[in-house]
Amino acid sequence: MKFAFLILGAFDEARDRAQIAGGAAQIVGVPDVEAACRQAQRLMDEGIGCIELCGAFGEAGARRVMQATG
């Protein structure tokens, strides 16, 4: 299974990202919840099956990302 980890902070979502194992594991830095929603949808479209969020999202932010990805 491919998975990703989204981290929230002073990041540039287009630049602050990394992957290992040929993209099977990815990490993406996002500046806000809206960017996290965009990136989560992109990751799912690319076949990521599990997205983990850092604790900085809080319950409300995590809920918004979950809603954005269905």
Residues of each region from the PLM?
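N-terminal basic/disordered segments at the start of proteins
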Residues: 1-12
